């Protein structure tokens, strides 16, 4: 049996989304960085290390896409119109009741 050659172990690498800042400006995801004549994706690589107490920022394990915020669903026009009609009916009923009370009070005064 011959001895097999082993490949040297490489540290696990993790993709981080944003490139380093150049002149205080953050590169956006759709801008590409050129390395020589080859177009390379805008990703920097960091080695994953165990977190220490002094380390504040966590190294992301993967680049997550930003989630779109969902808008709350509004009731459709049919429900809106029904609610408006009911509100108007109750308002009219209340106004009629107040008017009839005023009429009764006016008749008592005379």
From Swiss-Prot:
It is found in: Nucleus; Chromosome. One of its GO terms (biological process) is spermatogenesis. Transmembrane segments: none annotated. Signal peptide: none annotated. It comes from the Eukaryota. The keyword Aminoacyl-tRNA synthetase does not apply. PANTHER family: PROTEIN GAR2-LIKE, SPERMATID NUCLEAR TRANSITION PROTEIN 4. This is Spermatid nuclear transition protein 3.
């Amino acid at each position: 049996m011959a001895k097999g050659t082993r490949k040297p172990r490489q540290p696990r690498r993790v993709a981080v989304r944003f490139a380093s800042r150049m002149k205080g400006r953050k590169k956006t995801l759709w801008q590409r960085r050129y390395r020589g004549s080859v177009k390379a994706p805008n990703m920097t690589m960091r080695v994953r290390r165990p977190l220490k107490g002094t380390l504040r920022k966590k190294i992301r394990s993967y680049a997550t896409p930003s989630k779109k915020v969902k808008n709350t669903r509004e009731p459709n026009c049919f429900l809106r119109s029904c609610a408006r009609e009911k509100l108007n009916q109750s308002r009219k009923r209340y106004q009629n009741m107040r008017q009839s009370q005023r009429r009764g009070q006016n008749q008592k005064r005379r």
